[in-house]
Curated annotation (Swiss-Prot):
Molecular function terms from GO: triose-phosphate isomerase activity
TM helices/strands, residue ranges: none
GO biological process, alphabetically ordered: gluconeogenesis; glyceraldehyde-3-phosphate biosynthetic process; glycerol catabolic process; glycolytic process
Protein name: Triosephosphate isomerase
Single GO cellular component term: cytosol
Length: 252
């Protein structure tokens, strides 16, 4: 089953609106056809209006880095999935380890967010990943499998087939340490196997699984050669236009 790759840059808390606009203008005309790959950037909430506007006539898709699970209400500081859809966002990244760690988000929160994102016609990119301690204890597949099952609970098979799962080992995020090709393949396959167990093999064959964690132009080709890796969620290398575009060289 051929799945279209998806390369998504996660800017995290970087770039002001002017910098976001300049980045989009630098990459937009150089992106490959959407027949070959989906390309997205996850912009901070303060940059979304500018980024969506700058990207609107290009193939570049735009993700929010988080949202709440309610559309409106007395939730000071939160981002409405309904408004994200009205603004023209395509994806929402949820469950990133930084959100889980610093802001104490639970699997239940992430599951509620996934449902709210789908209810508003957007696509979630759901992150999962283990700590170094869990990895070294040989419990990575078990731990990540539980995260994935909990995040997808109550979604329809059709919804799961259309979403993106991003496996990011916490010990490889922004550390310069990256998982080996075998680690990435084995864990992305483990993620897919959980989907197969919960929703059937047909759904598992359709869902796209990204690898994330110190992905760079120099190693992206190795990861993309893995049969169960359908893309990358990229932090640092997505901040500069040149390095972001170089991530797409795996197509050549």
């Amino acid at each position: 089953m051929s799945r279209k790759p998806i390369i998504a840059g996660n800017w995290k808390m970087n770039k002001n609106p002017q910098e976001a606009k300049a980045f989009v203008e630098a990459v937009a005309s150089k992106l490959p056809s959407t027949d070959l790959v989906d390309v997205a950037v996850a912009a901070p909430a303060v940059d979304l209006v500018t980024t969506i506007e700058a990207a609107k006539d290009s193939v570049l898709k735009v993700a929010a880095q988080n949202c709440y699970f309610e559309n409106t209400g007395a939730f000071t500081g939160e981002t409405s999935p309904k408004v994200l859809a009205e603004m023209g966002a395509d994806y929402v990244v949820i469950g990133h380890s930084e959100r889980r760690d610093y802001f104490h988000e639970t699997d239940e929160d992430i599951n509620k967010k996934a449902k709210a994102i789908f209810a508003n016609g957007l696509t979630p990119i759901i992150c999962c990943g283990e700590s170094l301690e869990t990895y070294e204890a040989g419990k990575a597949a078990e731990f990540v499998g539980a995260q994935v099952s909990a995040a997808l609970a109550g979604l329809s098979a059709e919804q799961v087939a259309s979403l993106v799962l991003a496996y990011e080992p916490i010990w490889a995020i922004g550390t310069g340490k990256s998982a080996t090709q075998d680690d990435a393949q084995n864990m992305c396959k483990a993620v897919r196997d959980v989907v197969a167990a919960d929703f059937g093999q047909e759904v598992a064959d359709k869902v796209r699984v990204q690898y994330g964690g110190s992905v760079k132009p120099e190693n992206v080709k190795d990861y993309m050669a893995c049969p169960d890796v359908d893309g990358a969620l990229v932090g640092g290398a997505s901040l500069e236009a040149d390095s972001f575009l170089a991530l797409l060289d795996f197509l050549n």
